[in-house]
């Protein structure tokens, strides 16, 4: 059934929003995996765990915003299978932050690709939505995680377990 509210919403944009929604859910799922790993009794880096838990919730909220947007534009939300995270074990905080940085860059590139598609299909509403809700936040997250990686290396990771402990106790907590 065709939506009565649909206007100037290209089917390619609708499909791309559904793919973006799925990617945000995958990111949330991956961050949940990281949270569970760092919260384990044999890892016990609770502030790092909380950082990933917060990011999981944030990515889930992003997915929900895409659902709401899809419905507002008269599109149809089509959920797809969410891929399992690439790992179950995340090693140390440095490895996990490097994986998180790559994930954020992947999400950012997908957002930029969606913005280009919206521009090509002359959809100023979708462009505005992406610019106001996502693009700046992605750049901030990439910078924040990049800074964490720099500081983790400065603390001697992956060789220095004390550096990882200090990072958990001070760096992640202070940046919240």
Swiss-Prot record:
The keyword Oxidoreductase applies. Pfam families: Ferritin. The keyword Metal-binding applies. It comes from the Eukaryota. Stores iron in a soluble, non-toxic, readily available form. Important for iron homeostasis. Has ferroxidase activity. Iron is taken up in the ferrous form and deposited as ferric hydroxides after oxidation. There are three types of ferritin subunits in amphibia: L, M and H chains. M and H chains are fast mineralizing; the L chain is very slow mineralizing. This is Ferritin, middle subunit.
């Amino acid at each position: 059934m065709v939506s009565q509210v649909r206007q100037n919403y290209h089917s390619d944009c609708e499909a791309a929003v559904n793919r973006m929604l799925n990617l945000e859910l995958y990111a949330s799922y991956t961050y949940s995996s990281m949270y569970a790993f760092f919260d384990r009794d044999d890892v016990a880096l609770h502030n790092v765990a909380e950082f990933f838990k917060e990011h999981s919730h944030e990515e889930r909220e992003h997915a929900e915003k895409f659902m709401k947007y899809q419905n507002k534009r008269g599109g149809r939300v089509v959920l797809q299978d969410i891929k399992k995270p690439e790992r179950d074990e995340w090693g140390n905080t440095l490895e996990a932050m490097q994986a998180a940085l790559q994930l954020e860059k992947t999400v950012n590139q997908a957002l930029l690709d969606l913005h280009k598609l919206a521009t090509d299909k002359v959809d100023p509403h979708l462009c505005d939505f992406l610019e106001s809700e996502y693009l700046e936040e992605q750049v901030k997250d990439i910078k924040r995680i990049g800074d964490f990686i720099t500081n983790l290396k400065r603390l001697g990771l992956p060789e220095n377990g004390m550096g990882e402990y200090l990072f958990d106790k001070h760096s992640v907590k202070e940046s919240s």
